[in-house]
Amino acid sequence: MKLNKVVLAYSGGLDTSVIIPWLKENFDCEVIAVVVDVGQEDDFDAIKEKAYKTGASKVYIEDAKEEFVNEYIFPTLKAGAIYEGKYLLGTSMARPLIAKKLVNIAKKENADAIAHGATGKGNDQVRFEVTIKALMPQIKIIAPWRIWNLKSREDELNYLTQKGIDIPFKKEESYSMDGNIWHLSHEGLDLEDPWNMPDFDKVLKITKNPLKLADLPETVEIEFEKGIPVKVNGQQMGGVELLKTLNKIGSNHGIGIADIVENRLVGMKSRGVYETPGGTILYYAHRELEYLCLDRATLHFKDMVAIRFAELVYDGLWFSPLREALSAFVDKTQEVVNGTVRLVLYRGNIYSAGSKSPNSLYIKDLATFEEDQMYNQKDAEGFINLFGLPLKVFGMVNRKEDE
């Protein structure tokens, strides 16, 4: 089958470098490589050069850091979305954005297909493809890992040699990693056995080993406006700068290390270690402010929304009507989430050290045991009688006197 142009999600790794000549051989097509910068801090000049050497006709380097932070990370933060109680969705949030950029370039280049290097066992194939289907339903999607005969890293290296492509790739001796401005994940090797404790000295790349820290605690203040962090220690910052600042602060104190066995969308469990220093601080601070500013009913209902929101993000359904509708609800709740939270960081732990807000629902005169004008304690009796009436009736009808 001949195609004119194929847009490829390119990372510069072995898999996507092999895909370029493979696409040209099997589809007799021009391959346009697209690298999306979501804060992974790669050598993009070297990646661009590698793409051309393996046969790409054109290479796009798309800087999407600001969009990633402001339009994907912060909405998820406001929702309080955490997958299965531990995973802060770093990879999950990035994939729909990358797919969106692929679609934009495919339209610009009038491409016939979009290709990606995700394997047939992981979540990313789903995240890429459902996003592409949502944004460009008519385009063909090519997933080489599901159709080619290359079964191993050695097969891939031999394929490049056969094609006369001489690019050195290091022997795979490290963990499989995925990084962006929000997090860095580690999978494979000894982590595949959930009984093995991670060797933090070997695994961690951005966060200091909390078991070996002897540093003094550090206090940090974060200010929010409508649920969005805008200041760190009194200094106004844009989203990218703010997250980088908190990543540095948090990593110095071993904050944000999560060892997770998660349920993949495709039916299996996987184990990974995640470093999310700045994100962990933001989630903690944001929640503390919500405790102060949200009423009981809204806070409790929002907790239920957060679970479903996290599932949608994890499953790659960022552009689904439900995710967008839930975000509209979240945005309404965040109108009153304004104020400052003070935290203390020490040896991998976060401690609350104060919070204040112009929208605080905490009123000292109501909470105190002293007499006040707003709350008449005698009113409680009638409330309890009515609140407990269903249980009283049930007991009268169904419980025996000697129970």
Swiss-Prot record:
Pathway: Amino-acid biosynthesis; L-arginine biosynthesis; L-arginine from L-ornithine and carbamoyl phosphate: step 2/3. SUPFAM superfamilies: Adenine nucleotide alpha hydrolases-like (SSF52402), Argininosuccinate synthetase, C-terminal domain (SSF69864). It is found in: Cytoplasm. Its EC number is 6.3.4.5. GO terms for molecular function: argininosuccinate synthase activity; ATP binding. Keywords: Amino-acid biosynthesis, Arginine biosynthesis, ATP-binding, Cytoplasm, Ligase, Nucleotide-binding. GO terms for biological process: argininosuccinate metabolic process; L-arginine biosynthetic process; urea cycle. Its main location: cytoplasm. One of its GO terms (cellular component) is cytoplasm. It catalyses: L-citrulline + L-aspartate + ATP = 2-(N(omega)-L-arginino)succinate + AMP + diphosphate + H(+). It holds the Pfam family Arginosuc_syn_C. L-citrulline binds at Y87, S92, N123, R127, S176, S185, E262, Y274. The keyword Heme does not apply. It is an enzyme of class 6 (ligase). Homotetramer. This is Argininosuccinate synthase. It comes from Caldicellulosiruptor bescii (strain ATCC BAA-1888 / DSM 6725 / KCTC 15123 / Z-1320). The lineage of its organism: Bacteria, Bacillati, Bacillota, Bacillota incertae sedis, Caldicellulosiruptorales.
